[in-house]
Amino acid sequence: MLSQHEYGAEKSRDFEAMRAGTAMDRRAGPPVEIRPSPSLRLGDKAPDFTQDSTQGPIHLYEWMGDSWAVLFSHPSDFTPVCTTELGMVARLKPEFDKRNVKAIGLSVDPLSYHDMWARDIAETQGVELNFPLLADADRKVAVLYDMIHPNAHATETVRSVFIIDPNKTVRLLHTYPASTGRNFDEVLRVIDSLQLTDDLQVATPVNWNLGDDVVILTSVRNQEADKLFPQGYKELKPYLRITPQPSR
C-alpha cells in the first residue's frame, strides 16, 4: 500500500502526464476489453454480484436483505465532485436508515485507493465514510450495470445511480454528466414516492415532496375513491383528482 506522501507524488505525476495527453492507466495489467452488456431498464431484476469493498466482500442480495438499496458509481477516486457526493451520502445516512435504504458506492479504483480517499473525505467533508464503497477493479459490476460506455475510457465509470427495491427490482436508473454532481435529496424524494405509491392507489405530481397532495390513479373509479380517500378529493378533470397524502 502506498503511503500518503508516495500516493500524492504519484498522483501529481499522473496529473502532469494527463495534461500532456500521455497518462498511463494507473491500474496495472493488460488493457481490458469492455463488451457492451444489455442495458438495464426499469422493472428489470438487478444483477446480483459479489465484490470487494471497504467493508469487506459484498454479496449484493445477501447484503440488501429486505432493504432497499441505492447503488451509485463515480468516475474516479480523488476527484472533486465525487468527494462532495460521498460526503453528502454519508451525512444522509439517518435519512436512508429511516426509509430502510442501504447506500453503496462503486468505482473501478483498487481498495487501497478507497481507503486513502476515505481519509480525505473525512478531512474535507467533516464526516466518516459510513457505507461500503465497492472496489470494482476487475470492472465486473460496472459491466453488469452498464456503467462503462464501450466508446469511453475503460478505466472510468459513468456517474450513475440505481434505486433497487427489496424484491431486487430496478426502480430508478439515472446517469449524470461527469461535470454534474448528483442531487441526493432528489434520490430520497423518489424513494419516498415509490414507497408511498407501492402501497396506495395514488401517484405523486410534479415537484411533490413527502406530505404534499397526491393524485388518484385513473384506474380508481369515483365510487371506490370515496371509500379509499375519506379526506375527500378535488376533481379538476375526470382524470385529475387531487387528495391529501394518505397515511400508509
Predicted stretch roles:
Residues 2-248:
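Chalcogenol-based redox active-site neighborhoods
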